[in-house]
Every structure is written in C-alpha cells, then in structure tokens.
Amino acid sequence: MRTTAQLPVYRTAANILFLLTEVARDVPRKLLRLTDRVLLDASEVLKTIAVANEFRGAERGYYLSLALANIQVIKTNVGIMKNMGFIRKERQTLLASLLKSLAAQVAAWRDSIKSEGQ
C-alpha cells in the first residue's frame, strides 16, 4: 500500500501548494488576506486527501467531497488574482491545468467509492 505522500493525487496537490506559495510571494501586501486564504485552502486540500486515505467508505467520500469544494474555491481565487493582474498568464495556465487534473483525480477517487458500494 502506498503512503499518502506517494499518491499521485497528493503530489499534484502539493505541486499546486508550491506554485501558490510562489504566487503569494510575488503579490502586493494589500492582497495578503486573499493569498493567505488561498494557501490555507490548498493546505486543506492536502489534509483532506491525507485523511481520506486513512478512511474507507462514506467517510472517505466525505473528505474527498471537502477536497473538491476547496479545489473549486482555489480555482475561483486564482481567477480573481489573474483578472487583477497578479498572476502571470503562464503561471495561471499551469495552475488551471493542475487544478483541473486534481479535481478529476479526486472526483474519480470519490466516484470509485460509490461504484464499489462502500
């Protein structure tokens, strides 16, 4: 069995947190509340994936649903920062791609639980 850190879904989430940390470093201080919130949401995604990996059945599905909700919030905040001109197009494109991939991975994992009847 893989450890949590070895899961591809966890590694994708960790890469997103790394990129968001770089973005937070480069934005003006007046956006500190927004960037802090985005970093907390990204950390929460990592935590919910780790917790989901420890559970089975409905509990696992619950934590994966929380991860999906946090991913959606991150997508929205990244869009706001892009529209305000605080994220370069290349970085936003990479983040959007990783967030889409992460959402697909988490949704597939959650849906596999439902199809197994757990």
Regions found by a protein language model. Name each.
Residues M1-Q118:
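Amphipathic alpha-helical assembly/interaction segments
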